[in-house]
Amino acid sequence: NTRLVGSEMCIRDRDGAGLANIKFDVSPGTRYISRFRSVKSQPIKNIFQHVNQRFENLYASDPAKLKDVDYLKANEAFTGELYLGHLRYGTFGKNSKENCHPFLRQNNWMTRNLVVAGNFNLTNVDELFDLLVNIGQHPKEVSDTITVIEKIGHFLDQENNRLFKEYNEKGYNNKEISSLIAKNMDIPSILKNASMDWDGGYTMAGLIGHGDAFVLRDPNGIRPAFWYEDDEVLVVTSERPVIQTAFNVKWENVNELKPGHALIVKKDFELKEVEINSPSNLQKCSFERIYFSRGTDKDIYKERLMLGSLVTPQVLEAVNFDLKRTVFSFIPNTAEMSYYGMIKATEDYLSGVKKKKIQELEQN
């Protein structure tokens, strides 16, 4: 029952990449959060080489241990149940390893640990930074991701404090309280309070140390999010074709996360899609759909064909309708579908020209 949440590791290298993993139910004194980030020229390849090297070394020294799940979980990194991967396309801050997601907020209490990665661009980072300062925090830098993780972390701490006080007053001891907090944490409330002042497009994925996870989408649906669940896994990505290819499922089996909603995944695999912020006017990001997303998505494919068709009149005017001396091509590769739409519309235009000339001949 491995859960994959927010797995955003596609084959297109950008400014860096990162991978985090959380193990369930490990003994105190055992590391349960693993993370590795890379800004190498091929960051994804570098990440998998780093992770796989551990198992290659183990295979060389003691192959039998590769089949010992208990040993692996107790001794090797990246052998947990919960994963969060991210590909960085930098639009804010420096392109350094420290700016690569996932970001980690650590604490000795399991339920206060937070791992966050996202596809987002907030327009009011300075305002959010000031809000953190006004509540007494001292953020180490002005960046959108640090601001987001500290904002979520602040309300995660408050939820921990609330539950601790509640169960302490009921007479539970500290060890019992830790388990009760993990079981009864109100994640929707945390996300609602944390995102109240966010302005912009975002899909935020987060893992909490004890095993809960969430993915939150902005109310306008600016940033995309899709999810799929079966008997073995739950996976969330920014692009539908990734899920279709990796899990060999049909388009209709992949769900779109509703704007303003969060997918909440409890450690016991209970799954809920909850409204966090009231959905507003749908404003899907044109950059995502026209340029960045895979053209193999059914909707994206149709939109790009239509885009090519719609720009054709302007293209024809720009070349003064002199198609004999016009060469059609496309840049970059993601414009290929739009190119086919433009060619189809141009062929339709030429068919109209031929029809008109035939009609003129008949009249003469």
Roles of regions detected by a PLM:
Residues 335:
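C-terminal substrate/ligand-recognition segments
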Residues 344-364:
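Short, glycine/charge-rich flexible loops or terminal/linker lids adjacent to PRPP-binding catalytic cores
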